[in-house]
């Protein structure tokens, strides 16, 4: 009698596929858990990652204004010079101005510092703009250096008015309409989670202006500063 050949016990392609999906789900689950743990830890300890002091920025802005008055270029230089003396490894002293379109508003910015938990920029326009502040994952402080910034929230019948020397604090999660009339510039400082704010900063460029050279410059400078700060141990 001829021997009956036994069928091979190789797993079917369907079984392989199911096994691959299970492994992928497991890996994604582990990565999600790890990322959530890191985010939770950083969230509970955000204060220790900040290198800029709110009181110092306010005092510095006011001293620069008292010394240089309406010479905004000199005011900005005064601020950057002192910041670079205080934090030489984390301050970009090279003035690299780029346009910024966000929330319907348009101005220009100079990135002084960018990291995972903080950014510090000079933002403004010589001809005026207005738009949506965005709803952010960080507290945003506008130290007004020239001109007057206006802000509006639904239900009010009068604007919030922020002249030179004052601070407009946009709290994390809040949203306003804002206006920077002709010749308004501010030292803008954000502290909290910065990466999620980048989507707001890129949205207009990707969906409206399609100004890809400016998007590239913004990405290049922001990425360079964030990576350099990470390498130096600054989140």
Curated annotation (Swiss-Prot):
Name the Gene Ontology molecular function terms of this record.
isomerase activity
Which UniProt keywords are present, listed alphabetically?
Endoplasmic reticulum, Isomerase, Lipid biosynthesis, Lipid metabolism, Membrane, Steroid biosynthesis, Steroid metabolism, Sterol biosynthesis, Sterol metabolism, Transmembrane, Transmembrane helix
Indicate whether Cytoplasm appears among the record's keywords: no
Pathway the protein takes part in: Steroid metabolism; ergosterol biosynthesis
Q: Which family does it belong to?
A: Belongs to the ERG2 family.
Q: In UniProt terms, what function does this protein have?
A: The third module or late pathway involves the ergosterol synthesis itself through consecutive reactions that mainly occur in the endoplasmic reticulum (ER) membrane. Firstly, the squalene synthase ERG9 catalyzes the condensation of 2 farnesyl pyrophosphate moieties to form squalene, which is the precursor of all steroids.
**Gene Ontology annotations of biological process type:** ergosterol biosynthetic process
Where is this gene product found? Answer: Endoplasmic reticulum membrane
Q: Which GO terms describe its cellular component?
A: endoplasmic reticulum membrane
For this protein, the Enzyme Commission number is 5.-.-.-
Quote the InterPro entries the UniProt record gives.
ERG2_sigma1_rcpt-like (IPR006716)
Where does this chain mainly localize? endoplasmic reticulum
Task: State whether keyword Plastid applies.
Answer: no
Q: What happens when the gene is disrupted?
A: Surprisingly, does not show changed sensitivity to amines and does not lead to depletion of ergosterol.
Q: What else is known?
A: In Fusarium, the biosynthesis pathway of the sterol precursors leading to the prevalent sterol ergosterol differs from yeast. The ringsystem of lanosterol in S.cerevisiae is firstly demethylised in three enzymatic steps leading to the intermediate zymosterol and secondly a methyl group is added to zymosterol by the sterol 24-C-methyltransferase to form fecosterol. In Fusarium, lanosterol is firstly transmethylated by the sterol 24-C-methyltransferase leading to the intermediate eburicol and secondly demethylated in three steps to form fecosterol.
Protein name, per record: C-8 sterol isomerase ERG2
Kindly give the membrane topology term recorded for this protein.
Single-pass membrane protein
What catalytic activity is recorded?
fecosterol = episterol
Species whose genome carries this gene: Gibberella zeae (strain ATCC MYA-4620 / CBS 123657 / FGSC 9075 / NRRL 31084 / PH-1)
Q: Where are the transmembrane segments?
A: 21-41
């Amino acid at each position: 009698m001829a021997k009956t050949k036994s069928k091979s016990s190789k797993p079917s392609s369907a079984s392989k596929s199911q096994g691959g999906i299970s492994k992928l789900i497991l890996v994604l689950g582990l990565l999600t858990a790890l990322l959530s743990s890191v985010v939770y830890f950083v969230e509970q300890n955000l204060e220790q990652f900040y290198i800029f002091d709110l009181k110092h920025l306010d005092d510095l802005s006011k001293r620069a204004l008292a010394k240089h008055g309406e010479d905004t270029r000199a005011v900005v230089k005064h601020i950057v010079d002192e910041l670079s003396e205080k934090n030489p490894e984390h301050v970009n002293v090279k003035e690299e101005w780029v346009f910024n379109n966000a929330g319907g508003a348009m101005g220009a910015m100079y990135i002084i510092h960018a990291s995972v938990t903080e950014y510090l920029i000079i933002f403004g326009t010589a001809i005026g703009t207005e738009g949506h502040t965005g709803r952010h994952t960080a507290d945003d402080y506008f130290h007004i250096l020239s001109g007057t910034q206006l802000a509006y929230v639904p239900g009010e019948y009068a604007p919030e008015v922020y002249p030179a020397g004052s601070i407009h604090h946009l709290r994390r999660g809040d949203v306003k309409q804002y206006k920077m009339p002709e010749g308004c510039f501010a030292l803008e400082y954000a502290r909290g989670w910065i990466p999620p704010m980048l989507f707001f900063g890129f949205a207009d460029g990707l969906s409206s202006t399609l100004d890809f050279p400016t998007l590239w410059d913004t990405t290049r400078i922001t990425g360079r500063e964030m990576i350099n700060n990470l390498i130096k141990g600054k989140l």
